[in-house]
Amino acid sequence: MSRYRGPRLKIIRRLGELPGLTRKTPKLKPDYINKSTPNKKVSQYCIRLEEKQKLRFHHGLAEQQLLKYVRIARRAKGSTGQVLLQLLEMRLDNIIFRLGMAPTIPGARQLVNHKHILVNNRAINVPSYRCKPKDIITTRDRPESRARITKNYEFSQTYKIPNHLTLHSLQSVGLVNKIVDRESIDLNINELLVVEYYSRKA
């Protein structure tokens, strides 16, 4: 299954707020609200599927990409669910998003693909690059790169930077302080249900 490129608000209506996908809030029409069936029993499979979809769409991953991360998390020490979230949160595209250098993760991925971003003074054009503590994220020293990042800062200046990151916006410099912990991940998701969904596949 490829990465989703369709209407983002359609996904938000179905799954709820996903800041990595879009910052827009859909207006629910009365007829859409009336379609809900609160008395209908939802299967455990559907509940697990929905949590998996939240994680996939928030990070903008294809199904096989997410499955790959689940398999890596299973081989690591510690809680599989928390390791999975850490792997995704430490991706370069997500770090750029969390620093406010891009309004969404797809926007951050575009910055990386077009080589607007440096990691430790090296141009990195791989969105899945795994950031490490003490990594320094900067904007490439060219007018187009600086203009795009500055515009994004203005858009996202009200967003709170998580404590595993530090941002010096005037210099367009971000610092990775440590591996992210669960409390710093601003995403309403039950990662254990995601792991359970993949229990027979990973």
Swiss-Prot record:
It holds the Pfam family S4. Keywords: Chloroplast, Plastid, Ribonucleoprotein, Ribosomal protein, RNA-binding, rRNA-binding. One of its GO terms (molecular function) is rRNA binding. It is found in: Plastid, Chloroplast. It comes from the Eukaryota. Signal peptide: none annotated. Part of the 30S ribosomal subunit. Contacts protein S5. The interaction surface between S4 and S5 is involved in control of translational fidelity. NCBIfam families: PRK05327.1, rpsD_bact. Belongs to the universal ribosomal protein uS4 family. HAMAP family: Ribosomal_uS4_B. PANTHER family: 30S 40S RIBOSOMAL PROTEIN, SMALL RIBOSOMAL SUBUNIT PROTEIN US4M. One of the primary rRNA binding proteins, it binds directly to 16S rRNA where it nucleates assembly of the body of the 30S subunit. This is Small ribosomal subunit protein uS4c. It comes from Huperzia lucidula. The gene is rps4.
